[in-house]
Amino acid sequence: MKSKVDLFVINKVREKRKELGISQRGLAAILECSPSFIGQGESDKFDIKYSVHQVFLIAQFFDCSPADFFPPINFDI
C-alpha cells in the first residue's frame, strides 16, 4: 500500500510532468522504465512507487530540487 508520503511524491511528479507537457511515455524514457510503470505508479490500484534514485533523476531532468517532490517536515504521516 502506498503511504501518504508516497502519494505526495507521486502527485508532485505528476503535476510537474503535466505542467511541462511530458507524457507518461516520456517520463518512462527518462527513467528507463516501461510506460506501464508510470501509469501504475500514478494509479491508486497498484503499489508501484518511485524510488529515491528515480526522484533524483526526475529532478535532474526537470532542473529542480528533489526536495520539490517531498512533503514538508511537518507533514502529517
Task: Show which residues each predicted segment covers.
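Conserved hydrophobic/aromatic packing and binding residues within compact polymer-binding modules
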Residues: V13, L27-A28, I38-G41, F69
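Recognition helix of helix-turn-helix/homeodomain-like DNA-binding domains
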Residues: E32-K49
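Short, charged recognition helix plus adjacent turn
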Residues: S3, Q60, D68-I77
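Alpha-helical residues within the helix-turn-helix
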Residues: K18, A29, Q60
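Short, basic-rich loop-to-helix N-cap that marks the start of a DNA-contacting helix
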Residues: K45-Q60
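A short, Lys/Arg-rich alpha-helix, primarily the initiator
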Residues: M1-L20
